[in-house]
Amino acid sequence: MRDIRITGGEPLVRQQVPHLIEMLAGIEKLEDLSLTTNGMLLAEQAQALHDAGLQRLNISLDTLNKEVFEKITRRDGLEKTLQGIDAAIKCGFKSVKLNTLAIKGVTESEVAELVRYALGRNVMLRFIEFMPLDTDRAWQQEQVFTGDQLLQILQNEFESVVPLSRPEPSQPAEEFQVAQGRVGIIRSVTAPFCEACNRIRITADGAVRNCLFATSETPLRGLIRAGASDEDLLSAIRGCLAGKAKAHGIDQDGFQPPDRPMYAIGG
């Protein structure tokens, strides 16, 4: 394990997150430490996170429209999120990226505006195809605004859209040079990258998951509380990884989404 990403839910609601970051940053041979956030609490915490050793930030930004933002998130928080983005940029993190969930009927009209917003701040924007991990379990294949559709809009709106090579096979995003910046497209539904996936997840209640879409998980919390040795824990984790499916199977008949929504898995 070389990289750790803190996700949620929303990790910044946890007390003393900078202290957690500081402890993780002290792990020997750790190469990368990052965090994904909705940005609403970021303005007041960005500097402390940076000083504690956090290297990279991914910030969710699905829209720049106040009313649409409230409909998606069920709260009035767009201004706080935008303030959080600007605060993060000023802190000088190694990387700040914006993640936009691409939903048909929502994203089409804002693709160009979102890209220009990111380009104007010299940060990378990544569009992510809508996955069946929503809280309301209302996902339908027809709602997926596909990578091909996104790329078509980019090509219509910008003079030059040039594909870039992936620096690592396990990187989920296809990257494109757009104007003076980069835009990513993560085709998690229409062109999944399961063969190159090198990630595991630990949930907030101490369970290991070998895939975002896994329907089973391996609990570690009970083992730890019972006094399990490091070797016992390692054996449990290896057993979990050995059961990893070849692919998530979203496009297969009979696909069953996981019992947990995204916020309860960590994504």
List where the protein language model places each region:
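Radical SAM/AdoMet-radical enzyme domain recognition
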Residues: 1-6, 10, 14-126
